[in-house]
Amino acid sequence: MSETTRLRIAIQKSGRLSKESQKLLKSCGVKFNVNEQRLIAHSDNMPIDLLRVRDDDIPGLVMDGVVDLGIIGENVLEEEQIERNSLGKPAECIKLRELDFGACRLSLAVPTEFNYQDASSLEGLRIATSYPNLLRRYMQEKGINYRDCMLKGSVEVAPRAGLSDGICDLVSTGATLEANGLYETEVIYRSMACIIQSTQSQPDDKQALINKILSRINGVVRAKESKYILLHAPTETLEQIVALLPGAENPTVLPLNDDTNRVAIHAVSTEDLFWDTMEQLTQLGASSILVMPIEKMMG
């Protein structure tokens, strides 16, 4: 693959998605070393360049075809698409899949002393946010007039500083809101990290590499959601035990040496194996129960 056809992937330079994005790519076998002073990191073993940029630059870089792939929060993607549509700029990209990190919600919040009934309680008030387009869309759908206060950061301090009556900001646990005397009132958007692709046509070798990376990402995500289960089971309760294994597909059943009344079961479960399930397995005579994480899956 020539220099001009190297796969370019944009990831967040710093912030809540940065480390998880790097971890995901390394789990997919992409080797690279990040120099905090440099924008670009070159892969050591694949024709891939990582561009480390601000998260709100990633959607535009993908939509304009500057990079081929981007890992971004859905909230940032949606905000940029609304903005670009309003300006008549290219706003198309291909969302390849959601990822298993970066979960958050964009919510309205008000001071604890505020008498909030519903969203109409914010009629005519000033709301601070870093997501004016998502907020505007929500408030228009509700038929609520408001004044916005655009901030790039530290949105949660706006009411206390006298800049706004309420806020619209990302929430993960709510601890930051509580620390600033606020409480969450409405969730207006739920978000996960996702991987997006440019709509520009790709050379065959580059598209093949994209497909390979996506296949590996699918395998990594599936592995995180799955567990490898091993146990010994009495033959007389075998069917009941298999039925208890959550999400198991065609478990492998093997005979045990010198024990015709028991078998070994190996299974991949796509759901969590909870303690109560393990206790039920034990009650049915299962023993030597092992539940192990899976690093990678394919096929």
UniProtKB/Swiss-Prot annotation:
Its EC number is 2.4.2.17. One of its GO terms (molecular function) is ATP binding. Its cofactor is Mg(2+). InterPro entries: ATP-PRT_HisG_long (IPR020621), ATP_PRibTrfase_cat (IPR013820), ATP_PRibTrfase_CS (IPR018198), ATP_PRibTrfase_HisG (IPR001348), HisG_C (IPR013115), N-reg_PII-like_a/b (IPR011322), N-reg_PII/ATP_PRibTrfase_C (IPR015867). Feedback inhibited by histidine. GO terms for cellular component: cytoplasm. It catalyses: 1-(5-phospho-beta-D-ribosyl)-ATP + diphosphate = 5-phospho-alpha-D-ribose 1-diphosphate + ATP. Catalyzes the condensation of ATP and 5-phosphoribose 1-diphosphate to form N'-(5'-phosphoribosyl)-ATP (PR-ATP). Has a crucial role in the pathway because the rate of histidine biosynthesis seems to be controlled primarily by regulation of HisG enzymatic activity. This is ATP phosphoribosyltransferase. The gene is hisG.
